[in-house]
Amino acid sequence: MMKGQLAGLMKQAQQMQENMKKMQEQLALIEVEGQSGAGLVKVTMTCRNEVRRVSIDPSLLADDKDMLEDLVAAAFNDAVRKAEVTSQEKMSGMTAGLPLPPGFKLPF
């Protein structure tokens, strides 16, 4: 490999690293909402999996504790899935054209 090619690759890698950092900052600002129980339990979190809010409809507070715990877990899992999908969609534009193996997730 020639010096010019190596320098070009290094510059390209540095640019991608800067872009990844910017994307991580953007993902920290994007919020998704997971729901369960037809919207009676809601979890709002960022695409970096930081939970911002948990909302439980007051009608559930008198109900079975185990059921409420299951609904909270389901809403949380729904939010995590939505955050993953959103993150993958945002990152796919950055990784377009890169020869990454199937299932390879960014950021590492």
Curated annotation (Swiss-Prot):
SUPFAM superfamilies (UniProt xref): YbaB-like (SSF82607)
GO cellular component, one term: bacterial nucleoid
Gene Ontology molecular functions: DNA binding
Disulfide bonds: none
Gene3D superfamilies: Nucleoid-associated protein YbaB-like domain (3.30.1310.10)
Keyword annotations of the record: Cytoplasm, DNA-binding
Ribonucleoprotein found in the keyword field: no
Protein's UniProt keywords contain Cytoplasm: yes
InterPro entries in UniProt: YbaB-like_sf, YbaB/EbfC
Cellular compartments annotated: Cytoplasm, Nucleoid
Family assignment from sequence similarity: Belongs to the YbaB/EbfC family.
Summary of subunit composition and partner proteins: Homodimer.
Matching HAMAP family: DNA_YbaB_EbfC
Job of this protein: Binds to DNA and alters its conformation. May be involved in regulation of gene expression, nucleoid organization and DNA protection.
UniProt-recorded name of the protein: Nucleoid-associated protein BTH_I2220
